[in-house]
């Protein structure tokens, strides 16, 4: 898929701006604070329902405005015969939102997020590797959400059961009142875990070749999965039953896929905690690119790739390796930087350039 038009209104420095990206490589340059990242934020907001720099109400809306608006028009479909044009709009006040997709009102942000797929690498992406388990769970679930149509319903089923069980635990409910939700949590949780495990196994097969190209010195060799309970010993139903007294005392559910995690393993390093910040960024980028390649294989089209401030996040050598990998694929890319990243010349990439200044994009 590739974005043909992106319109932004009342978002950070932008009062009104519109750009028409090329279908391949797009570079947005400008001084620090000019608004380059805000363009990617707008696209990310439509694809994820949130900014990668915080909540909508935490500074994303232009000062003095009541809300922001983003409109995206894009083509999707893996072949000319199957291509179609799609349009989505989102108005967000930080508290309330309204959205439209292909001329119809949408009741859930998930409908917009399911339509437009964007893989974003930005200065905070290292938390995928160096942070806690939540971003890694989101990473898995994003991939499943976009390649398995029924995954969202399964995920919502599990989350609903978890919320209900936790509410009962906080109320000090009697054990028999937990039985129905334990059954629902165990049934949906086992299925959710199986999906995540299969996806991670598939992703590992894509990740290792990507990592070998863009960061061979890391020696990334495997991904391991921790399901959130001792699955090799007991079923989730049994784990919930065994932990019931402790959960009632603590007021929350201690076992299940909401506590799952995964970890990269390296031939030359003892583990993710031994990574420098730069190595964590490279590992995160390799994971994101592997996820994009998996999306392309499963959906027969590439997601949009957004790379924020690539020149300062990676040195010239690694920039060239990343871009050389990407320019060989029919993916639309939007890259920001204060200047043309040196690695672009090394990768031999043709680009469409935009300049961002004083709240305008030229």
Swiss-Prot record:
InterPro entries listed in its UniProt record = DNA-binding_RecF, DNA-binding_RecF_CS, P-loop_NTPase, RecF/RecN/SMC_N, RecF_2
Q: List, in alphabetical order, the Gene Ontology terms for molecular function in this entry.
A: ATP binding; single-stranded DNA binding
Q: Where is this chain's protein located in or outside the cell?
A: Cytoplasm
Main localization category? cytoplasm
**Cellular component GO terms, alphabetical:** cytoplasm
Q: Where does ATP bind?
A: 30-37
Q: Name one Pfam family in it.
A: SMC_N
A biological process (GO) of this protein is: DNA synthesis involved in DNA repair
Question: What UniProt keywords are attached to this protein's entry?
Answer: ATP-binding, Cytoplasm, DNA damage, DNA repair, DNA replication, DNA-binding, Nucleotide-binding, SOS response
Describe the function of this protein. The RecF protein is involved in DNA metabolism; it is required for DNA replication and normal SOS inducibility. RecF binds preferentially to single-stranded, linear DNA. It also seems to bind ATP.
Return the similarity comment. Belongs to the RecF family.
HAMAP family named among the record's database cross-references:
RecF
* Protein known as: DNA replication and repair protein RecF
Q: Source gene? A: recF
């Amino acid at each position: 898929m590739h974005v043909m038009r992106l319109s932004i209104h009342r978002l950070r420095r932008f009062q009104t701006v519109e750009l028409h990206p090329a279908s391949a490589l797009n570079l947005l340059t400008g001084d620090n604070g000019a608004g380059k990242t805000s363009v990617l934020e707008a696209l990310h907001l439509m694809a994820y329902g949130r900014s990668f720099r915080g909540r909508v109400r935490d500074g994303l809306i232009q000062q003095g405005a009541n809300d922001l608006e983003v409109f995206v028009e894009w083509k999707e479909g893996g072949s000319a015969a199957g291509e179609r044009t799609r349009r989505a709009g989102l108005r967000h006040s930080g508290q309330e939102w309204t959205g439209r997709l292909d001329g119809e009102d949408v009741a859930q942000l998930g409908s917009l997020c399911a339509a437009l797929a964007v893989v974003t690498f930005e200065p905070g992406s290292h938390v995928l590797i160096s942070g806690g388990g939540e971003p890694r769970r989101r990473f898995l679930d994003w991939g499943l959400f976009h390649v398995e149509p029924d995954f969202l319903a399964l995920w919502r089923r599990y989350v609903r059961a978890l919320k209900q069980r936790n509410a009962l635990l906080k109320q000090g409910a009697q054990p028999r009142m937990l039985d129905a939700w334990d059954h629902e949590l165990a049934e949906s949780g086992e299925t959710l875990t199986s999906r995540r495990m299969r996806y991670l196994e598939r992703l590992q097969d894509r990740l290792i070749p990507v990592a070998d190209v863009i960061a061979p010195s890391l020696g990334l060799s495997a991904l391991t999965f921790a399901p959130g309970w001792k699955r090799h010993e007991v079923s989730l139903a049994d784990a919930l039953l065994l932990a019931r007294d402790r959960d009632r005392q603590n007021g929350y559910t201690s076992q299940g896929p909401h506590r799952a995690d995964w970890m990269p393993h390296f031939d030359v390093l003892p583990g993710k905690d031994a990574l420098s910040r730069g190595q964590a960024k490279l590992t995160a980028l390799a994971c994101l690119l592997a996820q994009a390649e998996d999306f392309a294989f499963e959906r027969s089209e590439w997601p949009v790739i957004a790379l924020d401030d690539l020149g300062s996040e990676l040195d010239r050598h690694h920039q060239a390796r990343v871009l050389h990998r990407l320019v060989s694929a029919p993916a639309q890319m939007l890259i920001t930087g204060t200047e043309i990243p040196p690695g672009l010349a090394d990768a031999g990439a043709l680009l469409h350039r935009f300049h961002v200044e004083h709240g305008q994009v030229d």
